[in-house]
Every structure is written in C-alpha cells, then in structure tokens.
UniProtKB/Swiss-Prot annotation:
Pfam families: CoaE. Residues 4-200 form the DPCK domain. Catalyzes the phosphorylation of the 3'-hydroxyl group of dephosphocoenzyme A to form coenzyme A. This is Dephospho-CoA kinase. It catalyses: 3'-dephospho-CoA + ATP = ADP + CoA + H(+). Keywords: ATP-binding, Coenzyme A biosynthesis, Cytoplasm, Kinase, Nucleotide-binding, Transferase. Belongs to the CoaE family. It comes from Escherichia coli O6:H1 (strain CFT073 / ATCC 700928 / UPEC). The keyword Nucleotide-binding applies. SUPFAM superfamilies: P-loop containing nucleoside triphosphate hydrolases. GO terms for molecular function: ATP binding; dephospho-CoA kinase activity. It is an enzyme of class 2 (transferase).
Length: 206
C-alpha cells in the first residue's frame, strides 16, 4: 500500500503550481484530469463509445474529442452526464490504481479537482486543500482562460463550496499571496508527509 495525499482546490486556486512544487521534490504526482484525458485519447474504446452515444460530431477531424461540445451537451442534462460518468469513472479509477502501484516515491500526491463533489477524499490517507478567496479564483481564471466573469461564476456555482473543501481538509495551503510562499509551505508539508508515510509503512508490515 502507498500513502496517498489528495490535493484539491477550486478552479484558479493554484493546484498545478502546488503539485509541481511537490514533483520538484521527487514526489510522484497522479493527476485525475490528465488521466481523464488519457482514457479518451484517439483510438481509445471510451472515445468510440462517446461517439456512438452522442454522435460522430463529438469527434474532431483529427480524431480527438470535442470537449467543449461534450461539456455543453451534458451541462444541462443530468441523465447524459450520469451516462458519461458511468463510462469514464471506472476507467479513470483503474488507471489511477495502476499509477499508484507503479509509484516509487515514499508517498504519492493525487490531484483531484472534484475530490469533494465525488466523495473521493475517503480514498486518501490525507487531504491537502489549496485555498484562495472566490474573488482571487475569478480574477485568476478570467486572466488565464480569457473568459468572462459570468462564465467563471457559473463554474464556481457548479463546484463544491470553499467551506465544503475546507471541511474535509487535513492541511491547507493559503495561496492568496505571493507565489514564493508556496515553496516553503510545500517543503514543510513534504517533511511531515515523509514522516506520516514512514509510520504508515511500518504499521502495514506484519
């Protein structure tokens, strides 16, 4: 068994920056979003299933998934969203387990944007939340993605609340300030997680 630290945060919170800081310290990072893209790569069985269910127009000329079109299709249709989740979630879970088993670092950092929404925090040994104010989320996401405030507000409304994320957190990184502060926070937590992982391994041994 591998000690798992789940990392989450709302859109624009800086999850990638924090994950990269852990990776720089030699920790294997398993990113749920990357895995979700991998299972629908051109030629993947799941991509064919999506095309069969939603129509061939969901596939671009280069064979890739038309993500925006699919998002728009399921956004206001719970039944279609449930169908897609039933298809993809088992595949994502399977690949996640494979990557955890292949990990070589003392603990793994599992990056899951929808950790709270899908109750996945129960699968982790510890939960780290990257926390920022909603206003910071709005500004960063508008700047990064070149989208309107209204668009970001819709995304925020569909995600778990800040309070819900903090309620499941074991550790919190406040990312409202300068990016430089992240490195020291990550270094401190890394040292702590190494201790926890070592204790976990010793308890697992017969």
């Amino acid at each position: 068994m591998r000690y798992i630290v789940a990392l989450t945060g709302g859109i624009g919170s800086g999850k990638s920056t924090v994950a990269n800081a852990f990776a720089d310290l030699g920790i294997n990072v398993i990113d749920a979003d990357i895995i979700a893209r991998q299972v629908v790569e051109p030629g993947a069985p799941a991509l064919h299933a999506i095309a069969d269910h939603f129509g061939a127009n969901m596939i671009a000329a280069d064979g890739t998934l038309q993500r925006r079109a699919l998002r728009e299709r399921i956004f206001a249709n719970p039944e279609e969203k449930n169908w897609l989740n039933a298809l993809l979630h088992p595949l994502i879970q399977q690949e996640t387990q494979h990557q955890i088993q292949r990990a070589t670092s003392p603990y793994v950092l599992w990056v899951v944007p929808l950790l709270v929404e899908n109750s996945l925090y129960k699968k982790a040994n510890r939960v780290l939340v990257v926390d920022v104010s909603p206003e910071t989320q709005l500004k960063r996401t508008m700047q990064r993605d070149d989208v309107t405030r209204e668009h970001v507000e819709q995304i925020l409304a569909a995600q778990a609340t800040r309070e819900a994320r903090l309620a499941v957190a074991d550790d919190v990184i406040d990312n409202n300030g300068a990016p430089d502060a992240i490195a020291s926070d990550v270094a401190r937590l890394h040292a702590y997680y190494l201790q926890l992982a070592s204790q976990f391994v010793s308890q697992e041994k017969p």
